[in-house]
Amino acid sequence: MQIILLEKVANLGQLGDVVNVKNGFARNFLIPQGKAKRATEANLKEFDARRAELEAKQAEILADAKVRAEKLNEAVITIAQKAGVDGRLFGSVTNVDVAEAVTAFGVQIKRHEVRLPNGPFKAIGEYDIEIALHHDVVTPIKIVVVGEA
């Protein structure tokens, strides 16, 4: 299926690109999330008319991501979890827990923006992770997991 991208999509293309994707990917993911439209003549004309508006919106989203990245740059976030005497956690620290801790720190992020390269944290310690606020804006932070009494 040919689609027009309404925003930058990783490993696919930039705003305004007409690309071929599998039907299910377009119908179930890209179109419902507003990332793309079918590449019909009417949609191509509508996109050309709205191109400047969409580019301005994407520039605003990128600027907002850069501002949030400045606030988070090299931040150290502490998360307290119940742990055993050997330093292993009862449960784990997931991307949801990290997103809540960063939001409490003062920067609003969503759970899908948190990148945990080795999966959830299962032990007390310091972990370096990345927060992907935008495709082009990724900022490193340090998570310190401490045990609760």
UniProtKB/Swiss-Prot annotation:
Pfam families: Ribosomal_L9_C, Ribosomal_L9_N. The keyword RNA-binding applies. InterPro entries: Ribosomal_bL9, Ribosomal_bL9/RNase_H1_N, Ribosomal_bL9_bac/chp, Ribosomal_bL9_C, Ribosomal_bL9_C_sf, Ribosomal_bL9_N, Ribosomal_bL9_N_sf. One of its GO terms (molecular function) is rRNA binding. Transmembrane segments: none annotated. Keywords: Ribonucleoprotein, Ribosomal protein, RNA-binding, rRNA-binding. One of its GO terms (biological process) is translation. The keyword RNA-binding applies. GO terms for cellular component: ribonucleoprotein complex; ribosome. Belongs to the bacterial ribosomal protein bL9 family. Binds to the 23S rRNA. This is Large ribosomal subunit protein bL9.
